Every structure is written in C-alpha cells, then in structure tokens.
C-alpha cells in the first residue's frame, strides 16, 4: 500500500514538472509574483517562471529591483494588496500591485494637486460572487453575469477617490 502511494506521488510529481510553470510556485511565490508581475515585461515574466528553484526566482526578483517593492510593506498590508481591498489613501504602487494596469487612464486637470490621474478598471462578476479584474482577451468574460467599471482618482500618486 505504501509503495503504491509512493509511486502515485512520484507520478504526480513527474506530471506536474511538465505542466504550467505557474503551478510550480509555492503559495508565497504566487503571492509576490501576482503582485509584482505588473512591473515585469512579458520576457521578464517568462524568465522568472523558467527559473527552476524558489531561491533562483527570488534572486531574479531581487536583481530586477522588485523584491522590496512588495516586501517593504508589513504582512497585514501585503494581505490587503493580495485581497484587492484598495482604499483611499493607498499609494499608486499598492493599487497597481492589487489591481494591475488599468483598462484606461487619463490625466486630469483642474484639481488642487500637482498631478492627478483617472484610472478605469473593468471587473467581471461571476455567479459564485467572485470578482475578477477584466483584461483584454479575457477567457472568462463570457461566464460573467456582469462586467462593470470602477474609477480610481489618484492625486499625487495617492488614491483620492474610488467610484463605481
């Protein structure tokens, strides 16, 4: 019985090696990859995923200068970023790590700040209540019960308003 279990586990391990490289990531790695991929080009994302060990992947992020962007925050703030609970007062960096690049963005004039921007994000709402950030070419949008937008106003790189 133990031998069969060992063989089954070995088989599952061998099958997983050839699978999607994202599935190889530990929960912690997936968390920082998900937050930091917004700052990586497609080539950098692929290079990150090609690294064989967690140590190599972590060193890769450090070499790109991205590691501290996420780990500068205390654990409770990192958890808020990962859960997507964007709130007024958040920095632009935290917003981008939580929701990624916006669907659309515009410079705003006439506000009492040095720099003001409007970021528009699209979301998919699914039957089970999940919200997924919509991206161009989404493969899940057809399952959504609705697609809606949220507008975020950034004043001097700080979230000032969230509408929608």
Describe the residue ranges of each PLM region:
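Bacterial N-terminal signal peptides that target proteins for export
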Residues: 1-8
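Intrinsically disordered, low-complexity segments enriched in polar/charged small residues
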Residues: 8-9, 155
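C-terminal motif of bacterial Sec signal peptides marking the signal peptidase cleavage site
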Residues: 16-18
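Residues within mature, well-folded domains
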Residues: 20-164
């Amino acid at each position: 019985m133990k031998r069969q279990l060992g063989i089954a586990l070995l088989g599952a391990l061998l099958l997983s090696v050839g699978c999607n490289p994202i599935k190889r990531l530990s929960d912690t790695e997936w968390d920082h990859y998900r937050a930091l991929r917004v700052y990586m080009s497609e080539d950098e994302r692929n290079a990150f995923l090609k690294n064989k060990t967690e140590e190599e992947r972590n060193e890769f992020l450090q070499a790109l200068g991205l590691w501290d962007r996420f780990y500068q925050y205390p654990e409770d703030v990192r958890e808020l970023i990962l859960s997507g609970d964007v709130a007024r007062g958040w920095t632009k960096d935290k917003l981008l790590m939580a929701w990624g690049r916006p669907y659309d963005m515009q410079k705003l004039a006439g506000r009492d700040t040095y720099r003001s921007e409007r970021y528009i994000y699209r979301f998919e709402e699914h039957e089970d209540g999940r919200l997924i950030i919509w991206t161009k070419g989404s493969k899940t949008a057809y399952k959504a019960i609705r697609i809606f937008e949220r507008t975020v106003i950034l004043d001097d790189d700080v979230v000032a308003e969230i509408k929608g």
